[in-house]
Amino acid sequence: MLVSSSFASSIDSVMSHETMSLRRNPPFIDTPEKMPNPTASPNGTIHHLIDPSLPLLSSTTSSSRSTLSSTLNSPPPPPLTTSYSSYNSSACQSITSSPTDNTALAHNSKCYFPHSLSPTPLSSNSSSHVILPPISSFTNLITVAEREFNGRSNSLHANFTSPVPRTVLDHHRHELTFCNPNNTTGFKTITPSPPTQHQSILPTAVDNVPRSKSVSSLPVSGFPPLIVKQQQQQQLNSSSSASALPSIHSPLTNEHTSRYSSSLKDSAKITKQRKKKECPICHNFYANLSTHKSTHLTPEDRPHKCPICQRGFARNNDLIRHKKRHWKDEFMQIYARESDNNSGADDQDDTARTSANNDSDDSNDKLAASSSSEETKLLKKNQLKSLYKIKGAFKCPYNSTLINLDMEVYPHKSRSLYFEPINCHQTGVFSRCDTFKNHLKALHFEYPPKTKKEDRGVVPGKCKHCGLQFPNVDVWLNKHVGKGCGYSYH
């Protein structure tokens, strides 16, 4: 039997009132146990849904009441089957949408129910009444609404700069994929990244959501929609500002800088090596090929020749080292000449002495002893002269014996000295430069008391002969010895 137009208008008015009150306060729903018996009072089925303060049904005429009673007693239309799954999905979308959408839905639809169908009346043997959806469905709607309200209030004090946990992000991506399975190809695979790059993960997952659905309309449990939107905006701003700045701290830039600095240090420490050339005779490579070629020549044809033995050498240093070997021969030659001259003079003295003192044996013994001592002194003097005349030898400028010998050989250099010479060495002549310098540092420079041998090069001191102070022994040796102090040989 068809429902009359007056009954339909009454139902629409009641449902519109309940719809308008639902946005302000939670809906008041009675359980089936509290509902009156429909068989005892047919009109009671509608009265428990109507607010007595509204003059909606109180102003209706008696004809409307009779029409309503006759309609309730009529057989109900065939039941329409609806699925609670479609109801739940529609209810979730309607509740989590914006208030503007709720208002438009309340004004455009005839009945503000979670599903677009009218309440399903159930038939019975005696009478029929309207059965609303289960109370558990409305409880879910109320829970979602309270969660959205609490999320908006808590978002004022939320810290949006904190990183999003990876577990929540994976759950969020799973929910996005579950709610929109047709757009799974738009998601990008998020690879693990360092902790400093976690800010770029959330915008990648949220930007792929279709623009028809906002983030707040997606059912993400435990993640307030407003917080997701604000975090998305903040992450987008941070990513755009980071992309605008030059990446001066990128691993590539740091690696390039470190390699460039290390190459500069290596080039500063290592000098440029000379290019080696191949010898045409032995086919070996040498940096100084011209010097090496002289080694293939015979000793007579080499450029540096010894003036004594006429032996040739490829390098001048080899010639200097070779000349020192001739010092012994030169010393013996000089000593032989000096001894011959002195022996001739001694022979003349001996003949005069023997002719004058033939009668006294004691005097002969004394003359023999004196002659032996004089010969020893003369021998040493001749040896010193022979060493003194060797060219290239290093002579101590403070040796008293060598200074007196030089003044004797060159009388015009005899003068008073402004320093006190000492007998520091037996001869005062050295064949090697390092030995000569070690002699000067050890015997002619005064160090502070208790100075260790390894500290002599850094401690200050003074000259033993003139008393001048110097910061270290090297300054004294290079700027004072032989220039400001000491004897200059001929």
From Swiss-Prot:
Residues 250-265 have a biased composition (Polar residues). The keyword Nucleus applies. Residues 1-85, 231-273, 338-375 are annotated as: Disordered. GO terms for molecular function: sequence-specific DNA binding; zinc ion binding. The modification Phosphoserine is found at S153, S155. It is found in: Cytoplasm; Mitochondrion; Nucleus. InterPro entries: Znf_C2H2_sf, Znf_C2H2_type. Keywords: Cytoplasm, Metal-binding, Mitochondrion, Nucleus, Phosphoprotein, Zinc, Zinc-finger. A zinc finger (C2H2-type) spans 304-326. This is Zinc finger protein STP4. It comes from Saccharomyces cerevisiae (strain ATCC 204508 / S288c). The gene is STP4.
